[in-house]
Design a protein with these regions (language model features):
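Structured helix-beta-strand junction loops
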Residues: 19-20, 58-59, 117
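Short glycine/proline- and charge-enriched loop/turn segments
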Residues: 31-38, 82-86
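Conserved SAM-binding loop
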Residues: 1-35, 50-53, 121-125
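A C-terminal cap/extension of S-adenosyl-L-methionine-dependent methyltransferases
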Residues: 67-127
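A SAM-dependent methyltransferase catalytic signature shared across enzymes that methylate proteins
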Residues: 53-68, 125
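Acceptor-substrate binding/catalytic loop of class I
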Residues: 36-54, 67-68
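Short, solvent-exposed loop/helix junctions and linker helices
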Residues: 3, 46, 113-114
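Gly/Ser/Thr-rich beta-alpha loop segments that engage phosphate groups in nucleotides
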Residues: 22, 44, 118
Length: 127
């Protein structure tokens, strides 16, 4: 989430959508795991489903929202509250991309996309 004025940006995006169009947002999830690393890479905040959908522009209707990277969320929580590593090493990123993300792709549907390190929201502009 690299946008300081998130509500205004969603309004601008909604204004560009044609009737029947979709707006898809992928954002970091759960403010409770916001870390110095988030800040270092330009994240202003993290969202849960309720918080992200609260930003719904008046011209759009929520269509779907779900979480991704369930295993990543658990590891981020461990890092945030136990290890307290401020930024990942290149080796950590390599393990994450090659192991954690593929395993999360298997785990996410099993947990119903109910939690994860990222959240996806989809809005539709009515016809």
């Amino acid at each position: 989430e690299h946008i300081e004025d998130d509500r205004a940006e969603l309004e601008r995006a909604a204004a560009r959508l044609a009737p029947g169009g979709h707006l898809i947002v992928l954002s970091p999830a759960y403010q409770s795991v916001y870390s110095p690393f988030d800040k270092a890479i330009g994240h202003f905040r993290r969202y849960d489903r309720k918080g992200l959908l609260a930003l719904t522009p008046p011209s759009l209707r929520p269509a779907r929202s779900f979480y991704l990277d369930s295993l990543g969320l658990m590891l981020s929580a461990v890092n945030r509250f136990v290890a307290r590593q401020s930024s990942p090493t290149p080796a950590t990123i390599k393990v994450w991309d090659r192991t954690i993300v593929p395993l999360s792709r298997i785990a996410d549907p099993l947990v119903g996309h109910a939690f994860g390190r990222s959240i996806v929201a989809v809005w539709t502009r009515p016809v």
